[in-house]
């Protein structure tokens, strides 16, 4: 390696040409020696490093300082080119430190009162890296190089772990992962050069990982979901400002180096106390997916805006809320469709009748009323239906299931619509009123049948007595009064009835069923008419 004797300030000038002519030959010789001895004789960078005191450094001109920096960086390149990529230590030359000192003089003391510039001596080599908080206040982070005393043997163990887990180093160039608590300085390792920084006028070297060989496996398993290698070029060639992000639940700090000092966008996720700035974050592909990825209750990842939205859905089932009525939806697409009902926007129109609908699925169901298509068929009786919900309701006639029960009388129904109509009997509600005679009905179907009396449409007349009916079923029941037909027979006593409702009421005599209960005294009855008569007793007492 190119080791130079720089004991005096003028040594660089005397050895300039010799150093550059003999560099290649010297490097080849040193690499050969290194390959044969590195496993037997552990070596650190301090063995080949050359340091200046502050007084010596001030006596060098700019050309000598540049030469010193080039030689030191070349030594690092030689180390890292052997067999595998060694973990490089941070090098900021005394020239860079002088520029840092000049910049720090322009910083108000109140911002970082504890930061003092220490002269660089042979006993203490202090490294400094600039970073900015959102307030653009420049602070300094001290990294002491003399504490880094790990050997190449330790680095080789760490490299084997990296190779075993197949994690390329390039994937980690954007992130610095560190516990929020104080980290021992000996853990800071594996630094990578970035492009020329315009502020410092030198090459900055940032950490690729902060863990030694014994920490590598844990480090990679914990932050395995952060792999991303497409943004390394997005934040170079500009003033690099560092943003600090914290997850208060998992006690983790994440650093992101973005290329612009100005904060463009901010995203805050209050569930974990995580704060996100800038819209150029990498998107973890396996966020909350893999076993070794960061779980929700110990978030150790930096989320993209879209990932943040997805993560929020794991905490709140229905995140998107309508600002007009407060109704919430799990997906924003459903909310957008629902808002059309407030705006009166209807996009889908039936070509047959001109009726319009909010969504295409409702239109498709409606079109079946015109085409007569019935794709849903009962596998027991073969009856077909145009809608799947109608088939489900029909299947309950075979199974006898009646899941919808009236909480007042206990009567059960196979469909919710029947229960809604039934409840109007208890409330006395009659929403549908005839505009001709004012008569009201509790269902729209009854009103439609009634209107036929006024219009004369499809009027059914009894041939025996001349009485007219609006429905054919009503005519059939009436004809039975003339013929005496009683098709509905009780299986217990063989008594017959002309209508099915009369048979149902009769069967309750045998079963003892009394579904109609008084809510005031608790007395039950087998027929609703008996309950109505009973309620008059309570109303008469109240009036007295």
Swiss-Prot record:
Subcellular location as annotated: Nucleus
Domain KRAB intervals: 43-113
UniProt keyword list: DNA-binding, Metal-binding, Nucleus, Repeat, Transcription, Transcription regulation, Zinc, Zinc-finger
SMART domains cross-referenced by the UniProt entry: KRAB, ZnF_C2H2
Molecular function as annotated in GO: DNA-binding transcription factor activity, RNA polymerase II-specific; RNA polymerase II transcription regulatory region sequence-specific DNA binding; zinc ion binding
GO biological process: regulation of transcription by RNA polymerase II
One GO cellular component, as annotated: nucleus
Predominant subcellular localization, coarse grouping: nucleus
Family annotation (InterPro entries): Ikaros_C2H2-ZF, KRAB, KRAB_dom_sf, Znf_C2H2_sf, Znf_C2H2_type
Chain positions of all zinc fingers (C2H2-type): 320-342, 348-370, 376-398, 404-426, 432-454, 460-482, 488-510, 516-538
PANTHER family assigned to the protein according to its UniProt record, in alphabetical order: ZINC FINGER PROTEIN, ZINC FINGER PROTEIN 564
Known function: May be involved in transcriptional regulation.
Family the UniProt entry places it in: Belongs to the krueppel C2H2-type zinc-finger protein family.
Protein name (database record): Zinc finger protein 891
Gene name of the record: ZNF891
């Amino acid at each position: 390696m190119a080791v130079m004797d720089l004991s005096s300030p003028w040594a660089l000038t005397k050895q300039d040409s010799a150093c550059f002519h003999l560099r290649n030959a010297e490097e080849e010789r040193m690499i050969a020696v290194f390959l044969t001895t590195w496993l037997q004789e552990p070596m650190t960078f301090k063995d080949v490093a050359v340091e200046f005191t502050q007084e010596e450094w001030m006596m060098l001109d700019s050309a000598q300082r540049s030469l010193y920096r080039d030689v030191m960086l070349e030594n690092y390149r030689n180390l890292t080119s052997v067999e595998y990529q060694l973990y490089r230590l941070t090098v900021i030359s005394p020239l860079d430190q002088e520029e840092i000192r000049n910049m720090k003089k322009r910083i108000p003391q109140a911002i970082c009162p504890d930061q003092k510039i220490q002269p660089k001596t042979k006993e203490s080599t202090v490294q400094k890296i600039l970073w900015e908080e959102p307030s653009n206040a420049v602070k300094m982070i001290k990294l002491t190089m003399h504490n880094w005393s790990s050997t190449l043997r330790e680095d080789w163990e760490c490299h084997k772990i990296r190779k075993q887990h197949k994690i390329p180093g390039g994937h980690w160039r954007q992130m610095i992962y560190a516990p929020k608590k104080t980290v021992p300085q000996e853990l800071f390792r594996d630094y990578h050069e970035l492009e020329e920084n315009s502020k410092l006028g030198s090459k900055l070297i940032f950490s690729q990982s902060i863990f030694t060989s014994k920490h590598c496996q844990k480090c990679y398993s914990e932050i395995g979901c952060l792999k991303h290698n497409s943004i390394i070029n997005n934040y170079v060639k500009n003033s690099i400002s560092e943003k600090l992000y914290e997850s208060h639940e998992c006690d983790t700090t994440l650093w992101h180096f973005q290329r612009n000092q100005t904060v463009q966008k901010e995203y805050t996720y209050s569930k974990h106390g995580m704060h996100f700035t800038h819209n150029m974050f990498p998107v973890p592909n396996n966020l909350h997916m893999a076993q070794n990825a960061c779980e929700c209750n110990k978030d150790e990842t930096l989320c993209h805006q879209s990932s943040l939205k997805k993560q929020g859905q794991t905490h709140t089932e229905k995140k998107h809320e309508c600002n007009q009525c407060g109704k919430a939806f799990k997906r924003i697409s459903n909310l957008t469709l629902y808002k059309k009902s407030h705006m009166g926007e209807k996009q889908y129109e039936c070509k047959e009748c001109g009726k319009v609908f909010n969504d295409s699925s409702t239109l498709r169901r409606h079109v079946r009323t015109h085409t007569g298509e019935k794709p849903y068929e009962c596998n027991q009786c073969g009856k077909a239906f145009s809608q799947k919900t109608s088939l489900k309701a029909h299947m309950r006639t075979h199974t006898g299931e009646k899941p919808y029960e009236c909480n007042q009388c206990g009567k059960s129904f196979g469909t919710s619509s029947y229960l809604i109509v039934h409840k109007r009997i208890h409330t006395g509600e009659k929403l549908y009123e005839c505009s001709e005679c004012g008569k009201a009905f509790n269902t729209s179907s009854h009103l439609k049948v009634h209107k036929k009396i006024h219009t004369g449409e499809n009027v059914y007349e009894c041939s025996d007595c001349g009485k007219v009916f609006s429905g054919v079923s009503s005519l059939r029941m009436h004809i039975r009064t003339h013929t005496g037909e009683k098709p509905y027979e009780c299986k217990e006593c063989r008594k017959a009835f002309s209508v099915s409702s009369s048979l149902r009421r009769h069967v309750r005599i045998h079963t003892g069923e009394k579904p109609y209960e008084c809510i005031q005294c608790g007395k039950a009855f087998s027929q609703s008419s008996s309950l109505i008569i009973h309620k008059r007793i309570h109303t008469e007492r109240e009036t007295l």
